[in-house]
């Protein structure tokens, strides 16, 4: 079937016209022409990912003042609206006529009417930008094609950093995900993000914050989760990182809610992904790739001592977009928690700023955007079309009172259900609302869940049953506090928990059986603290960190059981696994009381 490009004649450049003609993709042309007709831009720039396209987009970002050039070569800064600083949960909808627990839905016809009304003529007086990308390594079993349309050069610049340009891969009538964004008038009351799963299309308007506007980031995750569940693989909010053991590199995926340790964990080994993972069973083995080739990371708290790899990226020439940090008068940047001297004045997302105002210089959800190739710890297989074999899965939370620093699950089912599906974590600044409220957030993906948790978990359990080699599952918690509200661990201690997990993967160390999983022996951690961090690890510290608060674990298990018992399609395995854990906890409470020291468990 020959593609009809007549609707685009005279609207796009001759070069773009000929290139689109060459790939013969009617669905793509239809999508472009309909979006142009809806949004009525003055001009359309079709970016094919060539160097001159990338340079043009960067130039336009500066000309439109969506970005400002900084003194370091390649560095720019972007400011979002003061009320558009994080993912907008309340303005984000899955378009479906179903009512889905924990999912913000809107009837599809109603949502489309509202969205198309907001987008109508939204690009008048502006230039439209079109980009073509692949989520995952190009021409691989993992690759998913996507098209972004936007009137924001900052958005398309971000996507050129974060994703693989892949125009040539659209040859023929290949399916692709569709993303339409307009900054509109930045009327926050009319900010809307709507995900039409049925048509694999996401609409976004009156916002520029990347989590709401960069389509291939978390907006695409809703579409790829749906695709994964329907096809029997996993699309996850997970880092992928390689950790060295005595038998070579072991790759782990790591799921943490935003701002809870995912990026810092991904910097402890060889980096493949800091945020997202496509995971498939290939010949009975669990393999994963990064859909992205860049990082959109939280910058608050990044300092030279704790985060040397990221610090280096942010202080050398190269492509970096800072967002919502402080810009100093000399074209430098400052962010809270950087542990450098705070400047006297500058400019941030609220306008002119002075130290004497007492206000924070940067937003707690301020970000940086950089290509993976800028990171010194980048793994050689970061773009391997075959992916990497996954030996372990980490589910981490920000839990101040209950979970011990590290636990290993008894099995795939036990780990998926009592660790991953039971995650509760304190809310962070990455979402709009009150911080430090404990939230149910299974697999750290609830914000991006487009379907029933029951269906999602059933796919997880089925996926595990199809594996011949099953990764071990671990619970991590870097944020446990004592009764005086002081953290029980330093930032660097996470290196030890990782080392212990690697030793468990290599079957090099035993562990203590508890009702909630396996925990480390003191002697093993003492050796690891010495060899990894060069510091002494006391029995007192170990006991404080690994004493199991049985009553609190029981309360948590009962909370989670209640949640899943009220979801109609929850697999029976979920309830049975949680009930078995509850029974074990009741048995231990009967034997030991509300708490039990790990030393008591060793003696028993």
Swiss-Prot record:
Keywords: Cytoplasm, Decarboxylase, Gluconeogenesis, GTP-binding, Lyase, Manganese, Metal-binding, Nucleotide-binding. GTP binds at residues 259-264, 367, 398. It is found in: Cytoplasm. SUPFAM superfamilies: PEP carboxykinase N-terminal domain, PEP carboxykinase-like. InterPro entries: PEP_carboxykinase_C (IPR013035), PEP_carboxykinase_GTP (IPR008209), PEP_carboxykinase_GTP_C (IPR035077), PEP_carboxykinase_GTP_N (IPR035078), PEP_carboxykinase_N (IPR008210). Mn(2+) binds at residues 218, 237, 275. Its EC number is 4.1.1.32. The active site is at residue 260. GO terms for molecular function: GTP binding; manganese ion binding; phosphoenolpyruvate carboxykinase (GTP) activity. GO terms for biological process: cellular response to glucose stimulus; gluconeogenesis; glycerol biosynthetic process from pyruvate; oxaloacetate metabolic process; propionate catabolic process; response to lipid; response to starvation. It comes from the Archaea. Substrate binds at residues 87, 209-211, 258, 365-367. Its cofactor is Mn(2+). It catalyses: oxaloacetate + GTP = phosphoenolpyruvate + GDP + CO2. Coiled coil: none annotated. GO terms for cellular component: cytosol. Binds 1 Mn(2+) ion per subunit. Pathway: Carbohydrate biosynthesis; gluconeogenesis. Belongs to the phosphoenolpyruvate carboxykinase [GTP] family. NCBIfam families: PRK04210.1. PANTHER family: PHOSPHOENOLPYRUVATE CARBOXYKINASE, PHOSPHOENOLPYRUVATE CARBOXYKINASE [GTP]-RELATED. Catalyzes the conversion of oxaloacetate (OAA) to phosphoenolpyruvate (PEP), the rate-limiting step in the metabolic pathway that produces glucose from lactate and other precursors derived from the citric acid cycle. This is Phosphoenolpyruvate carboxykinase [GTP]. It comes from Sulfolobus acidocaldarius (strain ATCC 33909 / DSM 639 / JCM 8929 / NBRC 15157 / NCIMB 11770).
